[in-house]
């Protein structure tokens, strides 16, 4: 197994540790979870660059890399929902992202069974980057709140502002998620009809 594929697998292996850090309430648990998410996100940047620059692109990598992204992002969103960071309507973006990811994965599986590999397109990459940025900003804001709370500083107003910023970024990434899903479907509709 080559280095880019190992980095992709590392991203998946980090997910259970991320879940524990998110859901087990201990001092600065958002900092720990955010660091794990950050390391996993960095592997996403490097696996593709290394694969392309060293001519190590494989069918496994084309399939597993976006799958690892889906697992990481969906896990983060579900954890945010569980701990109340996405608010009353937070389930809506999570459901939209989940539906899109299942639909695109279905397209990929149908294509793979016919010997065709559906690689990520630019809209899929924009979607992933916007999700990673939104999630990372939420972590950064939660770490600020953890520090302020540790210093016994009132966080009421700051917490509310952070809540709206974080939710706005998640909803923006959800728009990109919808666009990329529609484009995937449009680009592969003729192939799906034939199968």
Where are these regions (language model features)?
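C-terminal membrane-associated helical module and adjoining short loops/tails
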Residues: 1-5, 14-15, 34-41, 115-195
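Membrane-embedded alpha-helical segments that form the functional core of polytopic membrane enzymes
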Residues: 14-63, 76-98, 161-176
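Multi-pass alpha-helical membrane architecture of UbiA-family
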Residues: 4-7, 79
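Cytoplasmic juxtamembrane interface segments
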Residues: 2, 11, 95-121
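Structural signature of transmembrane alpha-helix termini at the membrane-water interface
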Residues: 17-24, 46-49, 78-84, 103-106, ...
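Core segments of transmembrane alpha-helices
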Residues: 10-17, 68-77, 104-105, 127-139
């Amino acid at each position: 197994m080559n280095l880019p594929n190992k980095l992709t697998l590392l991203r998946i292996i980090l997910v259970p540790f991320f879940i524990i850090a998110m859901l087990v309430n201990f001092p600065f648990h958002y900092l720990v979870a955010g660091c794990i998410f950050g390391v996993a996100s960095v592997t996403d940047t490097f696996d593709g660059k290394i694969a392309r620059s060293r001519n190590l692109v494989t069918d496994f990598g084309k399939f597993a890399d976006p799958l690892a992204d889906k697992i990481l992002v969906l896990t983060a969103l579900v954890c945010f929902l569980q701990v109340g960071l996405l608010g009353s309507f937070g389930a809506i973006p999570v459901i939209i992202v989940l539906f899109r990811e299942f639909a695109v994965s279905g397209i990929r599986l149908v294509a793979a069974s016919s010997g065709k590999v559906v690689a990520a397109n630019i809209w899929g990459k924009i979607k992933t980057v916007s999700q990673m940025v939104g999630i990372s900003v939420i972590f950064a804001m939660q770490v600020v709140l953890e520090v302020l709370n540790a210093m016994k500083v009132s966080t009421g107003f700051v917490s509310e502002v952070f809540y709206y910023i974080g939710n706005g970024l998640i909803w923006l990434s959800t728009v990109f998620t919808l666009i990329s899903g529609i484009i995937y479907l449009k680009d592969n509709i003729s192939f799906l009809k034939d199968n």
